[in-house]
């Protein structure tokens, strides 16, 4: 039974700029099982993450290069990406 999981998290656009970081590997507790739970956990990580995640109204996510909903399950070693919705013009 797992106690923690390692997830690589990539940030794009405004999130990357706000965090001054394009990727990090995080060790998450066993209570964090989905994309949405990871987003909430990252938001609570520290003041910088909270400011970055709350400044973007809707954050899209991908897991291992595939668009994912908040309910998508995570597994050890997954690569997630968070980014604002793409706007065209």
Region spans (language model):
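Ubiquitin-like/PB1-type beta-grasp interaction modules and other compact soluble beta-rich domains
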Residues: 1-88
